[in-house]
Amino acid sequence: MDTGFADSNNDSSPGEGSKRGNSGIEGPVPMDVELAAAKSKRLSEPFFLKNVLLEKSGDTSDLTALALSVHAVMLESGFVLLDHGSDKFSFSKKLLSVSLRYTLPELITRKDTNTVESVTVRFQNIGPRLVVYGTLGGSCKRVHMTSLDKSRFLPVIDLVVDTLKFEKQGSSSYYREVFMLWRMVKDELVIPLLIGLCDKAGLESPPCLMLLPTELKLKILELLPGVSIGYMACVCTEMRYLASDNDLWEHKCLEEGKGCLWKLYTGDVDWKRKFASFWRRKRLDLLARRNPPIKKSNPRFPTLFPDRRDRREPFDRFGPSDFYRFGLRDPRDRFGPRDPRDPHFYGFRY
């Protein structure tokens, strides 16, 4: 494994603690004190990230800072680190890739960590971005990936480490960037790995939408707009089956199309198709109101007295074809457009 560590410790246990089980995070200030000092629920993730950075960082390289940020999300989600030989993370600035192995505390039942079901997280240093790949058991059959912009997240991570500076200068944009980093890593990498590892090891899956009862999932779909239900149908096969319920789409038609005469439809009606037609018409009407068509005058009966709001001359309303058809000439142009059938069309008349 191409991981660089500093300050090796031979007495370390095979797994690093997590927030889910035995945390094992022994910083200068306990986590409960940090959270109490935060005085706000929104600071839980930034202060947990700060604890991990202060405790595990062995250098100030960009790869170490971003890798520890991903490591903090893994710990918060319940993972523990395998095969670590040190309490400090220290990655060389010239290092292009790093791999780490994680597992769950419930799976550590033997001293031989090579036989434990695990996930592999690989960090690829590519120019201004750090690409993080996650695989189940090191297999490349299904790869989960997220990409982190260094110029976007590194200043926020540096600010999180300096608690006093973060509290004084930390505006809503800094908090938003911290939670954006946390959500990107958790949604795109950590949660899929956690679900896959639990399914492979026979453990109970983490709380998620698909584990809810069918009646509750249908109730959630009823509260969504019709367009959002269409998006939910693209999530998985089960959600597509639930979103195809005919009674659900009848309810959406009556709810969103109150001005339509839905009661005229009798018998077996495909309400999903009716809602799709209604939504297309509604969208076209909205576009028509935003971009009204230009009112054109009748070329056979030109307006002698133009509208005061329209400062153009009457002849300006005609196009080239109108000049050719009626033999008209632009009064401002001595040699205006003529009929192509005119023998003097390509030269002067005089």
From Swiss-Prot:
<feature type="domain" description="F-box">
    <location>
        <begin position="206"/>
        <end position="252"/>
    </location>
</feature>
<protein>
    <recommendedName>
        <fullName>Putative F-box protein At1g23770</fullName>
    </recommendedName>
</protein>
<feature type="compositionally biased region" description="Polar residues">
    <location>
        <begin position="1"/>
        <end position="15"/>
    </location>
</feature>
<dbReference type="InterPro" id="IPR036047">
    <property type="entry name" value="F-box-like_dom_sf"/>
</dbReference>
<dbReference type="Pfam" id="PF12937">
    <property type="entry name" value="F-box-like"/>
</dbReference>
<feature type="region of interest" description="Disordered">
    <location>
        <begin position="1"/>
        <end position="29"/>
    </location>
</feature>
<dbReference type="InterPro" id="IPR001810">
    <property type="entry name" value="F-box_dom"/>
</dbReference>
